[in-house]
């Protein structure tokens, strides 16, 4: 059928097609802009509630050397105390923070595994994973980031079972004079 059309008719057909394509693009852009404009601020914004503070005593740090994943650093956890509105006790000797340091990226992955014992004798297992980043932000300014997300395993039939059923965040508290590290634990509500 194209052979029957004159060259000027084919140009018109091409121009008409281009107009239709342009209209489709404009309509799609309008829908996209409208969809972005309709995105509302989420109503369920998580809140943080202070759960307790840990004062952790530490042993002598040692390195396992450079591994296939980075430099493995071990920091023994030798004890300490913790206290909050609904919980209080001691940190059991024998845990450790198994850090994986990547010096080229100024990044360290944390994985602390230890137990705590409440004042009424209940043992709770803790696994705290996090990140320390001591580099630069997107603008090239110095940036320090240290956050972790502890998970707790408390006896299901204890008054501490609430630790099993929530997410928690952990932040360091460098404002206190303490030989070791002070960590604040926050429950995500």
Walk through the language-model features, giving the residues of each.
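Beta-strand-enriched cores of mature, soluble protein domains
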Residues: 38-189
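Bacterial Sec-dependent N-terminal signal peptides
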Residues: 1-40
């Amino acid at each position: 059928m194209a052979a029957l059309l004159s060259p000027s008719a084919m140009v018109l057909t091409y121009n008409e097609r281009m107009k239709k394509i342009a209209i489709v693009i404009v309509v799609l852009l309008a829908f996209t802009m409208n969809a972005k404009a309709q995105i509302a601020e989420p109503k369920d914004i998580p809140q943080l509630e202070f759960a307790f503070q840990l004062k952790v005593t530490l042993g002598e740090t040692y390195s396992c050397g450079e591994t296939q994943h980075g430099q493995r650093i071990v920091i023994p956890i030798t004890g300490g105390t913790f206290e909050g509105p609904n919980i209080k006790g001691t940190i059991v000797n024998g845990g450790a923070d198994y850090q994986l340091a990547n010096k080229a990226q100024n990044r360290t992955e944390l994985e602390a595994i230890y137990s705590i014992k409440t004042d009424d004798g209940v043992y709770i297992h803790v696994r705290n994973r996090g990140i320390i980043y001591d580099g630069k932000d997107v603008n090239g300014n110095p940036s320090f980031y240290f956050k972790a997300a502890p998970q707790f395993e408390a006896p299901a039939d204890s008054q501490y079972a609430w630790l099993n059923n929530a997410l928690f965040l952990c932040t360091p508290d460098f404002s206190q004079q303490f030989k070791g590290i002070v960590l604040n634990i926050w429950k995500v509500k």
